[in-house]
A protein has these predicted regions:
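Active-site anion-handling motifs in enzyme catalytic cores
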Residues: 1-207
Length: 207
């Protein structure tokens, strides 16, 4: 490749170890569009009541689901998931967790934009929560201890949102309605976006 970039520190480190080349860390492509751009692709979901969106790698952890059930009762809001596997759905019913009828990226973004509280366990869940200015929390799972997976940690640090990272055990001990001040976050995202466009323009111009 004539040009190469990565979005995380580990990727930069591994490429340097393998090739001796230090590549730049550039924003994920999803950050190159503004919230206004993304909102043109979706529509507000027609859920009349306030609700919590839970977006995770998997939904089969009974301990986590028990906590989420208590969260739903505490805030008097149902919890919705999207794209849950069919064999998980019957297990989620007993916790009062609902499966949204739509799926895919557009369904997820539409649901996220409408949610009152967003609980995520993914890099892109954090990205879109920040772009849409959501009251969100990034969940760390004690079961997953992959130190090489730094995606969530890095994007939280890049945007100044480190305090939004919590464990499932914290969900009942803090006020999940705590708003996020997105003033500085927006500045940081715009700086990341500008750096990315500058890099893209450099290789398009053949520099």
């Amino acid at each position: 490749f004539d040009y190469l970039s990565v979005r995380e520190n580990n990727g930069q480190k591994w490429i340097k170890e393998l090739t001796g080349i230090e590549v730049p860390i550039i924003a994920d492509p999803t950050l190159l569009l503004t919230s206004k751009d993304w909102l043109q692709c979706i529509k507000t979901e027609e859920i009349e009541e306030k609700f919590i969106l839970y977006y995770s790698f998997f939904y089969s952890n009974e301990y986590n689901n028990e906590i989420l059930s208590e969260v739903s009762k505490k805030y008097k809001m149902p919890i919705y998931i999207i794209d849950g596997k069919q064999w998980n759905i019957h297990k989620l019913d007993k916790y009062g967790i609902r499966l949204w009828k739509k799926s895919g990226p557009v369904g997820l973004l539409s649901l996220m934009n409408s949610a009152s509280i967003v609980l995520v366990q993914s890099f892109h869940g954090i990205v879109f929560s920040a772009l849409f200015h959501k009251t969100f929390w990034s969940l760390r799972n004690k079961v997953i201890k992959n130190v090489n997976d730094d995606r969530a940690r890095v994007i939280l640090a890049q945007t100044g949102l480190e305090k939004r990272a919590i464990c499932y055990d914290d969900l009942l001990n803090i006020d999940l309605k705590q708003d996020v001040d997105y003033t500085e976050v927006d500045v940081k995202i715009q700086q990341m976006r500008a750096k990315a466009f500058e890099y893209i323009e450099s290789f398009l111009d053949g520099e």
